[in-house]
Every structure is written in structure tokens, then in C-alpha cells.
Amino acid sequence: MHFLTQELSFPNTNESTRDGLLAIGGDLSTQRLLLAYENGIFPWFEEGEPIMWWSPRQRMVLFFDALVVSHSMRNVINKNIFKVTFNKAFREVIQNCQSVKREGQHGTWITNEMIESYCKLHELGKAISVEIWQNDTLVGGLYGVDMFPVFCGESMFSKVSNASKMAFISLADYLKTNHYNLLDCQIYNDHLNSLGCREIPRDEFLKFLKK
């Protein structure tokens, strides 16, 4: 595990710890963030902690043909109860991802500094949001970093049932249509697994990132 200086560089991802921690320090400038994502590295830390950079040995990803859409979710889609937009409310989406209550979590890893940094990426066209609306109210969404041919998903939120699933499915459809290789979901969880995501070795993930 390495300590970063102001120099714009990262250690080799193979030098990460067993749990995936690669480096501590540096900053959240757009240049450093883009360099990180180009090399399969992402920031993840809580308010008050130093900036921590991660590159897990196993990467959770979605190959689009493996996407699982349940029968009940297909009914939701067919009823047109949600409106889907892209890049209409990026800041609102990331702020909701920051503030939403999550089971088992007492804090948030989306700091105020991180919000400003990702909003700058969005202004550069490198960060994308998906918004889910119901009766003109934002009820769900997600955001991530566009590193074509890979999209790096960061976080999603839902204020009503199925809203975040709708965002995820809509994003997957958009990425498949536009010839992306895969959707990076970073770390395993049961919810992502239920949607068809699976883990692949880091080296395999990096090959997709470099294609």
C-alpha cells in the first residue's frame, strides 16, 4: 500500500492489499480521477478519512447479455410508471446518493468534496447520470464515470420501489446499444448479483478497460 504525493501517478494495481486498498492520499482533481479510472482504480472513503484508492482483485461487472430482468420488473417497465432521462439532474442524483439511508451504513462515502469533483467530471462529459422520475419528482437514479468502452458505475439511489432497478436496466440498455464492453460495478453485493452481475479477475477487467 502506497502513500501518494502531488505527483500525478498511481502504483501498479498488482500492489494492492488483499482487500484491494492500493494507495492513500493525493487529491480528487479531474486529472487524477481520470487517471485512476483509466487504470481500474477508484476512490472510496468516508468523511474525515484520508482519500483511499482501491483496486480489488475481483471486479463485479455486468455483461449486458447476462442482465436479469424479473417478470415483475418487466410489468413495471410495461406500465410506464417511470420516466427515464440521462444527464438532466446530475448534481441532484449524486446528492441523493449521498443522503439516502442505507441498511447497515451509518455514514456516507460520498463526501462533499467528491460531489464537486464528480460534477466537474460531468461538465467535461466524463460523468453521466440516469434519472428516474415519477410525476415530475426525482425518485431514483445513478451516476458513474464514462471510460468507453467501459462504464464505471459509482452509486445509485431509490426513493420508491424499483426506481434504482429501472435506472440500472435503462443504463445497461443504453450501454449495450452504444457498443460498450461492460458495466463496472466495482464490488460484489447480493443485489447486483441478482441483476446478473458477476465477479471477474482484475487482470481480465483491465483488458476490457484497455480495448
Swiss-Prot record:
The keyword rRNA processing does not apply. Its EC number is 2.3.2.6. InterPro entries: Acyl_CoA_acyltransferase (IPR016181), Leu/Phe-tRNA_Trfase (IPR004616), Leu/Phe-tRNA_Trfase_C (IPR042203), Leu/Phe-tRNA_Trfase_N (IPR042221). One of its GO terms (cellular component) is cytoplasm. It catalyses: N-terminal L-lysyl-[protein] + L-leucyl-tRNA(Leu) = N-terminal L-leucyl-L-lysyl-[protein] + tRNA(Leu) + H(+); N-terminal L-arginyl-[protein] + L-leucyl-tRNA(Leu) = N-terminal L-leucyl-L-arginyl-[protein] + tRNA(Leu) + H(+); L-phenylalanyl-tRNA(Phe) + an N-terminal L-alpha-aminoacyl-[protein] = an N-terminal L-phenylalanyl-L-alpha-aminoacyl-[protein] + tRNA(Phe). GO terms for molecular function: leucyl-tRNA--protein transferase activity. PANTHER family: LEUCYL/PHENYLALANYL-TRNA--PROTEIN TRANSFERASE (PTHR30098), LEUCYL_PHENYLALANYL-TRNA--PROTEIN TRANSFERASE (PTHR30098:SF2). Belongs to the L/F-transferase family. Functions in the N-end rule pathway of protein degradation where it conjugates Leu, Phe and, less efficiently, Met from aminoacyl-tRNAs to the N-termini of proteins containing an N-terminal arginine or lysine. This is Leucyl/phenylalanyl-tRNA--protein transferase. The lineage of its organism: Bacteria, Pseudomonadati, Bacteroidota, Flavobacteriia, Flavobacteriales. The gene is aat.
